[in-house]
């Protein structure tokens, strides 16, 4: 069983009667059973990702209505454990432009469907390296940053601040383990030392005992400049800062966080996007919202420039070295031709302010400085 909801035909101005070019987009989502966490202060929004797609459709239709382009967005949301490929087959009958919000294995299963050959798919949720390397697919582009881009951004900041020695605390969930591995690779890449590691194994409520338990947990660490936290499920990281044995900054999944988007980004016209999103969703924009927004804006830019909704035509345009689009992050966004990853600055933020945008000044690249973040062409098996 799966649920299909017509989310939006047009959020903004209705398409004129003479519209000749329909552009049908589907958002495929595999819902997730979230593991229990210590705090519910920041619940995951039910419309995470979807809300970003909705405002992107509104933004895109504003221009499209003048050109005879009519955009529509359909949401197919599958309960946890359901079969997203069944919904994908149904969606591909009427839409050849698909956003996928799912785990890496499910994304690949959709991309490999016979019905998906010739379609254009956008991964808006998974930062897994294999999707950009050995398991890349010609019909799959990525607007969510890869984990390696986020961790590379963080290590550039640590290197710039000369915080050379770190320790690492890793949670028990697969997403935590994957992020920890990305942190290790990035640390090696940028010459940052991880002097010691510990696994987070507590399964009791620490909210009333953090001042006792966290110092004991971190007391045995050798001297360090920063505590790295791999806690992608938002379970324990918030309790490490200000409770550790040594007074050190926290970075990674909590503290100083590398992310695609955050509510503290204010420059480069970002406030306009933030305000439009909050007016629509009644909450701040998150990274997955931004990835969905970027995917539809990329589609809209390609349709506007080519006058076509053909997936092959749009893909060729998006992968052209001359393609750029504005992403409200100070640099033009473009796609890497070798693995379909959207090049984008990574915001390194704390809960109240933007620390910086990576790539950090001084980290150079022969082609594009944003290629210092994540898998560069020689590193990808794509």
Enumerate the predicted regions with their spans.
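Extracytosolic ligand-binding ectodomains
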Residues: 2-8, 18-382
């Amino acid at each position: 069983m799966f649920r299909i909801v017509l989310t939006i035909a047009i959020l903004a101005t209705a398409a004129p009667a003479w519209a000749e070019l329909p552009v049908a987009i589907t958002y495929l989502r595999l819902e997730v059973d979230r593991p229990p966490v210590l705090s519910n202060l920041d619940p995951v929004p039910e419309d995470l990702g979807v809300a970003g797609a909705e405002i992107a459709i509104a933004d895109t239709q504003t221009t499209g209505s003048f050109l005879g382009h009519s955009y529509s967005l359909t949401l197919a949301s599958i309960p946890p454990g359901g079969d997203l490929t069944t919904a994908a087959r149904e969606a591909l009958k009427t839409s050849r432009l698909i956003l996928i919000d799912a785990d890496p294995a499910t994304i690949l299963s959709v991309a490999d469907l016979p019905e998906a050959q010739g379609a254009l798919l956008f991964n808006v949720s998974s930062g897994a390296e294999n999707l950009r390397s050995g398991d890349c697919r010609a019909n799959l582009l990525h607007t969510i940053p890869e984990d390696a881009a986020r961790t590379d951004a963080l290590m550039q900041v640590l290197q710039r601040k000369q915080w050379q020695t770190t320790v690492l605390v890793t949670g028990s969930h697969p997403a935590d383990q994957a992020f920890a591995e990305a942190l290790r690779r990035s640390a090696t890449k940028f010459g940052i030392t991880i002097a010691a590691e510990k696994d987070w194994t507590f399964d009791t409520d620490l909210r009333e005992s953090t001042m006792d338990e966290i110092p004991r947990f971190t007391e045995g660490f050798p001297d360090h400049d920063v505590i790295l936290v791999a806690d992608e499920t938002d379970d324990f990281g918030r309790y490490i800062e200000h409770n550790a044995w040594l007074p050190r900054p926290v970075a990674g999944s909590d503290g100083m966080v590398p992310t695609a988007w955050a509510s503290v980004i204010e420059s480069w016209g970002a406030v306009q996007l933030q305000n439009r999103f909050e007016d629509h969703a009644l909450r701040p924009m998150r990274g997955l919202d931004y990835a969905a927004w970027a995917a539809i804006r990329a589609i809209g830019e390609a349709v506007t420039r080519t006058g076509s909704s053909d997936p092959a035509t749009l893909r060729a345009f998006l992968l052209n070295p001359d393609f750029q689009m504005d992403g409200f992050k100070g640099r033009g966004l473009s796609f890497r031709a070798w693995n379909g990853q959207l090049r984008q600055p990574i915001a390194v933020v704390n809960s109240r302010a933007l620390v910086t945008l990576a790539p950090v000044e001084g980290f150079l690249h022969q082609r594009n400085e944003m290629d210092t973040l994540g898998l560069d062409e020689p590193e990808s098996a794509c």
